[in-house]
Amino acid sequence: MVVCLTVSCAHNKTSLSIGPGVVSLSSPQDVIVEMTGETYDKLETILQQVSYVKLSAIPLLSRIKKIQIADERIYLWDLVVGIVCYDMSGELLFQLNARGQGPGEYTDINAFAVNASLHQLVIYDNMKQSLMFYSTEDGRFVKSEKFNKPTPAEIAYWGGYFFYHNRLHRNYQDDISLHYYLLASKDGITIGKRYFKHENNKEDYPFSPSGHNLYDNNSKLYYCRDFDNIVYQIHEDSVVPRFRINLPNPLPASMIEERPNEMSLLRSGYSLGITDIYEYGGLLFFRFVKDGYIWSCLYNVEESKQVYCAKRIKFLDSSLIDTIDGIYKDCFYSILTPEYLDYAFSENPLEDYPDLFKTYDVEGDNPVIAFYRAVVR
């Protein structure tokens, strides 16, 4: 989410068939952001809670890096326990945690994506410089393909293509064909298109303020580069600017060249790091960092007006929403972590919550996935 590459022995070789992808010159929709306060507590006028999925407590998750829901299955990448797959009732189906050098084993997970059409779960292992393919049915190892370069920070599969977010090129300085942020491949190995040439000032400053750059929006795939405010919609053969998010007091591009201290930058009065970009039902959700806080925003794209921009979002009474983490079918969804639920239970008595939560153990249970549908306006 370019010059062509083929795989030969241990080295990727450049083919002459790669070409630049088309970046549309159409004008994006402007999204004007204004801060509305500490808390927005009228969420029930915008979203309604639909259902909850309590994940099986074994294995116990601790550091969730990415979630993807596809074909009635929930895939979670946890930095400690690996990739875990659940059904839509929260029951464990399988766990990928085979670390090692043997067949079917990986040394580390650097990125992953689900190819639902081929029933494949794909892991990028930087140490092995390989793509590892597993079955989404039972986690069974299928194959390994050598993938020396690029070194993607993120993978998405959409519309029959693999899309790679390629942050840096320091490991292949001389191969300028790959000095691009977004690369596309039909088979996962051979790069077919490239978009957005690397900028030297960002190569020298590898800090990434955004949690992700590729966003699965159910029927659409969105992409936003680090330190950028343009959200692009990815198509099979082009990318189209969809939104221009105008943040208050945005970070000047010149500051990146100064390579400021990361924590000082996040605590500064500048706005940066647009992330978690999800649009459904005429509503666009996203987050960014300013003054050391993460701000959540909701924008009505049909009426071109902001709904809110606040540090916290909640329902008027008992609140069970932390942030928007994705879209599945006709719903937004949110990962309710034990830490968040512990806080929510301290704010409101347990009897205010659905029965599912009355026996919830914040010390020994896994997160709950909550689904929300846009209120018909």
Which residue stretches match the model-derived regions?
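Blade/loop signatures of beta-propeller domains
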Residues: T14-Y52
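Conserved blade-ending motifs and adjacent loop-strand segments that build the rim/top face
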Residues: F243-L266, E302-K329
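Beta-strand-rich domains and repeat architectures in extracellular enzymes and scaffolds
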Residues: I32-E34, Q49-V81
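Asp-box/WD-like beta-propeller blade repeats and closely related beta-sheet repeat scaffolds
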Residues: D108-I109, D125-Y172, S177, R194-N200
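Blade-loop segments of beta-propeller domains
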Residues: L55-K65, E91-L118, D125-N126
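Short beta-strand elements that form the blades of beta-propeller/WD-repeat-like
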Residues: S24, R73-D78, H119-D125, G160-Q173, ...
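Short coil/turn segments at the loop-to-beta-strand junctions that recur within blades
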Residues: P59-L60, N97-E105, K146-A153, K197-K202, ...
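Repeated scaffold domains used in trafficking and secretory/extracellular systems
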Residues: S62-K66, T107-F112, P150-G159, D204-H212, ...
